[in-house]
């Protein structure tokens, strides 16, 4: 590394340091609780934007024919992405701890978000009825296999992902969009005022109802963050397998050579 390179901090890593300061405010007990919740939200919004714009560009540079080197620190795009992911992993662990602290401080004020396994049997039955009447009718479960095209997954949207086994033993993947303007994300427990459950957790718990002909092997919630420089939605054709479209898009990116970032 050149002597001049030691005088600079990589811009992307410096930005993460800034966002950590935002996160620190969310964990600062001297800051009012409502403001701390706002800081936690700002941290996540900032991180989404960072991955959509900054990391997205670095990923494109990694696929370029010519290696792109950041001219202040001499780091390649690949080195920057590696450092970014390692740092974000640390920040996300810190965020999880702060989130638990915030939830703990909200509880004495009469606001709680709980998991399904903490409900009584009667409460579970009430929420099952709520799911059947107010959520399930508005869900669009999909099954993806070798013969079905992979669907477009929208940016910053939640999806329930399940690994399925058919009655004939064939393995498939199920995808259920969880973001919907028809039902609320926060569902209040009828027997506990101020106590809420996230709609995606309710969907995941009862997801077997959406796939009655399959055995659920594994299930989880995922969220997609897309590169803001690529408008993949405009390129997508409903009759086209999204995997094929992405392959074509990557092949196109291989012929691009973005200039180094300042």
Annotate the PLM regions:
Residues 1-9:
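Charged, compositionally biased N-terminal leader segments and the immediate start
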Residues 8-44:
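N-terminal-proximal low-complexity accessory segments that begin disordered
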Residues 27-30, 40-116:
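Extended, charge-enriched "interface" segments that sit outside catalytic cores
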Residues 94-101, 105, 112-115, 119-257:
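Duplex nucleic acid-engaging cores and interfaces of nucleic-acid transaction enzymes
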Residues 22, 39, 255-262:
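Conserved small/polar residues in nucleotide/adenosyl-binding loops
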Residues 11-15, 35, 43, 73-76, ...:
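Secondary-structure capping and boundary motifs in well-ordered enzyme cores
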Residues 34-35, 51-56, 60, 144-147, ...:
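Short, solvent-exposed secondary-structure capping/transition elements
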